[in-house]
Amino acid sequence: MRYLITGGGTGGHIYPALSIARALTEQDPEAELLYVGTRTGREAAIVPQAGIAFAVISSGGVVNLGLLQRVRGGLRAARGLLEALGHIRRFRPDIVIGTGGFVAGPVLAAARLARVPLVIQEQNAFPGVTNRLAARWATAVFVPYEEARAHFPPGVRLIRAGNPVRPEIASASREAGRQALGLSERDRVLVIMGGSGGARDFNRVAAEAVLQLDVPGLRVVHITGERYFGQVKAQYGDRAPHVTLLPYAHNMPEVYAAADAGLFRAGALTLAEIQVRRLPSVLIPSPNVTHNHQEWNARTLERRGAAIVLREGGLTPADLAAALTRLLTDEALADRMRAALGEVADPDAARTIARRIVGIARQSREAREARRGR
């Protein structure tokens, strides 16, 4: 069967789509895949490296922009709709799968016009605008948290399934992770990461907090993002021999496996990964995201006792150091958080979603062939 996948702009939309794509090929060995994105989104570099055919459309955002930018974005989206219809006509998919981002809007609308079944995978507790608008057309919408249900229109078929993560996240061993990072089993390891691009204020307060920590055997792996590596390195200076500073980590499965605790933003993919790893963490949601969706994500874990959540506004290094000290030294707290994370984790999410998609696509193809046979 043929599966057309769309979603992009950020890794939070792309990597779940790739996990679903991999699961589809496992369950349908004859699967043909086409990924539709933009030339300027990160998907243009990431998807071809995954060995998936990639097609391009025009698209543009219209949310939280000025009037002129919204008009330009709308015109690009209209052109993208026509281009998406062309891709659908040529590829003839049995189903279209959207994971969000403004690129998905024209493709999902084209699927609706072409009468191709579509499904949506939402990553956040507060759904993105593209997925909320397209949900009415969808055969199914997969949501990772029950809290997301309230934000979709009545009558939408919502299916609870976690955010897909790479199998390597769950399978990486603690021993291999520590070996890769030059850490011993006796070390108490804290991993800090503010997202793939880093974050200035997050990195600044995190580094100052680390310098205030007094935890026996502490080792810190601080992933700054390329942009802020120099600033954070200067901030630590020669005061932090126990800190391993990295601009980017290409081996995140091993990094997670090596950790005893984490300090992160609250992007959907990061939260799915710490759930699968059952990694007790302090979360500082980014205040610079649409609809404040990272705080919605973080609070869903906090309510379940699965994370400590701190707001960035007004956060002092001393406050953060106190929270991290508690996380690193209170074993009873860490055990409760690991248990709570295990309850919300869904390591089989990609396979669950793919199985449903294959079933819907098969029904669609059979119905189409039955109509032709009349």
Swiss-Prot record:
This is UDP-N-acetylglucosamine--N-acetylmuramyl-(pentapeptide) pyrophosphoryl-undecaprenol N-acetylglucosamine transferase. One of its GO terms (cellular component) is plasma membrane. The keyword Cell cycle applies. It holds the Pfam family Glyco_tran_28_C. Pathway: Cell wall biogenesis; peptidoglycan biosynthesis. It catalyses: di-trans,octa-cis-undecaprenyl diphospho-N-acetyl-alpha-D-muramoyl-L-alanyl-D-glutamyl-meso-2,6-diaminopimeloyl-D-alanyl-D-alanine + UDP-N-acetyl-alpha-D-glucosamine = di-trans,octa-cis-undecaprenyl diphospho-[N-acetyl-alpha-D-glucosaminyl-(1->4)]-N-acetyl-alpha-D-muramoyl-L-alanyl-D-glutamyl-meso-2,6-diaminopimeloyl-D-alanyl-D-alanine + UDP + H(+). Cell wall formation. Catalyzes the transfer of a GlcNAc subunit on undecaprenyl-pyrophosphoryl-MurNAc-pentapeptide (lipid intermediate I) to form undecaprenyl-pyrophosphoryl-MurNAc-(pentapeptide)GlcNAc (lipid intermediate II). It comes from the Bacteria. Keywords: Cell cycle, Cell division, Cell membrane, Cell shape, Cell wall biogenesis/degradation, Glycosyltransferase, Membrane, Peptidoglycan synthesis, Transferase. UDP-N-acetyl-alpha-D-glucosamine binds at residues 10-12, 124, 166, 196, 294.
